[in-house]
């Protein structure tokens, strides 16, 4: 059987936004009745990523978990925030014109680093469902990350489960 649903998360317009979606994913797996299979957590947004990581417990000065802040800091060195024209080739004049024709503010196009980071990390996580539970390891969590700092938005997280379900009266 295959089950699919979506959850919505709200992103900040000024900074990278992390959302712990573990509880929602576990709930959807539980409600599906899948005993053994896989779950895929996916973003169709090209400036977002889905990762598995442990909870750091400690908080940074920014209010993020320390591992989350470390990830942001590492990627700021690899793909710096778009702070000046010419830092990246994208967006070019055609991309800006396309955005304008589709009702987008040109400033929202200056999110090249978010596209690059999403491409490097990826936009999905696949985990095993074993005996009805998601195998994330002892300390694993699933995070949805919006790398786009140009505008706040409602983002969609897709959760797809596939596997063998318990049948009435046995397996």
Task: Give names to the regions the model predicted.
Residues 1-171:
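Active-site histidine-anchored catalytic micro-motif
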């Amino acid at each position: 059987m295959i089950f699919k649903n979506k959850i919505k998360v709200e992103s900040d317009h000024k900074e990278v936004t992390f959302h712990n979606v573990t509880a929602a994913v576990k709930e959807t797996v539980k409600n599906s009745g899948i005993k053994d299979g896989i779950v895929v957590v996916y973003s169709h947004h090209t400036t977002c990523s889905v990762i598995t990581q442990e909870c750091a417990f400690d908080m940074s000065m920014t209010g993020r978990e320390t591992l989350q802040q470390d990830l942001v800091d590492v990627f700021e060195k690899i793909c710096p925030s778009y702070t000046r024209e010419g830092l990246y080739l994208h967006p070019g004049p055609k991309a800006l014109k396309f955005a304008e024709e589709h009702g987008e503010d040109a400033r929202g196009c200056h999110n090249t680093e978010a596209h690059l980071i999403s491409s490097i990390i990826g936009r999905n996580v696949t985990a095993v469902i074993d005996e009805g539970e998601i195998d994330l390891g002892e300390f694993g969590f699933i995070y949805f990350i919006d790398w786009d700092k140009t505008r706040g938005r409602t983002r969609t997280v897709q959760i797809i489960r596939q596997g063998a379900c318990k049948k009435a009266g046995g397996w």
